[in-house]
Each structure stands twice: as C-alpha cells, then as structure tokens.
Amino acid sequence: MKAIIVFILFISSVHAMSKCNQAIYLNLDPHCGILPDCNLDGPNPSYLKRVSCERKENGKPGFIELIPGKCLHGKPRCSLK
C-alpha cells in the first residue's frame, strides 16, 4: 500500500513540474520558430510548440511565428529553454 501511495505522489510531482505536456510527433516537417532576435529550426511544428511553451515557463518569450521550412541565416539560434 505504501508503494502505491509513493508512486502516486511521484507521478503527481512529475506532472506538476511542467505544463508543457504536448505530444511531439515523429513526422519530419521542418519549421522555423521566429523571435525578433533569434530563430530555431525544428523537425516539426509540435516540437517547436513544446519548446515555445517551455521557454514561457522559464520566463523567456515564446515564438511569435512558426513558418514552414528551415530558418534563414542571419539571426542567432534561440536557446531551447
């Protein structure tokens, strides 16, 4: 019984750590996450949406726009978190 309670508490604490639980799909559909001062290439929009959410949780701005294709050179790479 104690093991079940510990397991439930563990799962609850892991879930409470992040609100960014969107599924990341495995399809290859390159997109670029755009911010005024940086860009980030991602394998697909779901990946970039999750990175954007995690950035917001860490007090950084989320992506303004996601555009199809790879990012253009000229801006630095955005940090993941």
UniProtKB/Swiss-Prot annotation:
Changing residue 75 to E: In strain: Zim63H-16C. The keyword Transport does not apply. Residues 1-16 form the signal peptide. It is found in: Secreted. Coiled coil: none annotated. One of its GO terms (cellular component) is extracellular space. GO terms for biological process: sexual reproduction. Main cells of accessory gland and seminal fluid. Keywords: Behavior, Secreted, Signal. It comes from the Eukaryota. Responsible for physiological and behavioral changes in mated female flies. This is Accessory gland protein Acp63F. The lineage of its organism: Eukaryota, Metazoa, Ecdysozoa, Arthropoda, Hexapoda.
